[in-house]
Design a protein with these regions (language model features):
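Active-site beta-loop-alpha junctions enriched in small/polar residues
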Residues: 22-26, 63-65, 95-99, 121-124, ...
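Structural preference for beta-strand elements that scaffold enzyme active sites
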Residues: 16-20, 57-59, 89-93, 115-118, ...
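Acidic (Asp/Glu)-rich catalytic clusters
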Residues: 14, 51-52, 84-87, 106-115, ...
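Catalytic alpha/beta core domains of metabolic enzymes, predominantly
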Residues: 116-175
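Conserved, mostly hydrophobic/aromatic
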Residues: 43, 50, 61, 117, ...
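Glycine-rich, proline-tolerant flexible connector loops at the mouths of alpha/beta enzymes
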Residues: 31, 56-78, 126
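N-terminal small/glycine-rich loop or linker at the start of catalytic domains
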Residues: 9-35, 118-125
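Alpha-helix-loop-beta-strand connector modules within alpha/beta enzyme cores
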Residues: 21, 69-94, 140-147
Length: 175
């Protein structure tokens, strides 16, 4: 049994659920935690372990040699190849988040047509910076996702983002 607050749940999970893993994230480094998978090989191995444990979606970030976030399509292509080989059937979701690049650089990997990609539909304040998602960029990312048949994972950080996502859906702007 797993205790969640005051509720106990059966660890066998009799009802279907979707488990999404973000094994790297955009910020943690080896200095923060030596177990953070940074290299492509580490990411594939960590994702494969999660897949074998039941995860069905992998939310993916890639890194530069110095462990900083990257939007490099070649890195995403290598990761996608490794995950498709070692995690057959897993849904692969790329991050288009702003820590890994500016403007349209954030969506250059969408040409690889992953199953899904994150789509932050508005700007918001993080503790140390503004996470900028101006309407023109959001619309461009959504159109690229639609062009390459990438399902968006809409990220909503406040109520206005939910309304924006509904409007985009109603206008058939989301794949």
């Amino acid at each position: 049994m797993i205790q969640t607050g005051s509720i106990y749940r059966d660890a066998t999970m009799k009802k279907p659920c979707i488990l999404c893993v973000a094994i790297t994230g955009s910020l943690p480094t080896k200095a923060d935690n030596p177990a953070v998978p940074i290299s492509l090989q580490e990411q594939v191995e960590s994702t494969q372990s999660a897949f074998e444990a039941g995860a069905t979606i992998a939310h993916c970030h890639v890194r530069n040699q110095d462990q900083t976030p990257s939007s490099d399509p070649e890195k995403f292509a290598a990761l996608l190849e490794g995950l498709n080989e070692h995690c057959p059937g897993m849904v692969i979701q790329f991050s288009t988040g702003g820590r890994s690049g500016a403007g349209t650089d954030r969506g250059r990997m969408l040409t690889l047509a992953p199953d899904m990609a994150s789509l932050s539909v508005g700007s918001n304040n993080f503790p140390t910076r503004v996470y900028e998602n101006p309407p023109d960029l959001v619309n461009w990312l959504a159109s690229e996702m639609k062009k390459y048949k990438v399902t968006p994972e809409v990220e909503a950080f406040d109520l206005s983002h939910i309304l924006t996502a509904i409007r985009m859906h109603d206008r058939n702007e989301l794949y």
